[in-house]
Amino acid sequence: MLYRDPYEFLKSIPKDKCIMCLDMGEKQIGIAFSDKTQLIATAHSVYYRKNISKDLGYLNRIFKKNEAGSIVIGLPLEIDGQKSEWCKTIIKFANKMIKKYKVSTYLQDESLSTSIAAHTLKISGVSTTKSKRIDDKISACIILQRTLDKINVIK
């Protein structure tokens, strides 16, 4: 099921399972996972997209390998909260994933996560070249940590 309400998503999250997070891009997907206590997000990897079938297959494999129980996907809302065309594409992707794998999926506003990731890497002394290779997984980590903070306040 696709959730926008953190209260409803919280009810669907299996206990003692990680949460996987995706920062969707046209060419790549940043991936992060929570720990099993669902308190801390950790950047995992960047996946370079191929086609919808291969993308879904790869994401399902690492979902299982990392013992995840649910998914968070960053949703790039406009400043005024409206959905962009890219949001609609992401929602379609999420619905395909849900239909194929029956996984609880939460859409988290990802506003400014890429800017925050780039700034964090810059002040940490990471080169621009390396930063461009890893900023998507750092963005996924930021998006997931926002969600974890939100659901842990609710608990």
From Swiss-Prot:
Compartments reported by the entry: Cytoplasm
Cited InterPro entries: RNaseH-like_sf (IPR012337), YqgF (IPR005227), YqgF/RNaseH-like_dom (IPR006641), YqgF/RNaseH-like_dom_sf (IPR037027)
Predominant localisation class: cytoplasm
Keywords per UniProt: Cytoplasm, Hydrolase, Nuclease, Ribosome biogenesis
Taxonomic source organism: Wolbachia sp. subsp. Brugia malayi (strain TRS)
Single biological process term from Gene Ontology: rRNA 5'-end processing
Phylogenetic lineage: Bacteria, Pseudomonadati, Pseudomonadota, Alphaproteobacteria, Rickettsiales
Signal sequence, renumbered to the chain: none
MF annotations from Gene Ontology: nuclease activity
Enzyme Commission designation: 3.1.-.-
Enzyme category, top tier: hydrolase
Recorded family membership: Belongs to the YqgF nuclease family.
Domain of life: Bacteria
Protein's UniProt name: Putative pre-16S rRNA nuclease
Stated role: Could be a nuclease involved in processing of the 5'-end of pre-16S rRNA.
GO cellular component, one term: cytosol
SS bonds (residue pairs): none
SMART domains associated with the record: YqgFc (SM00732)
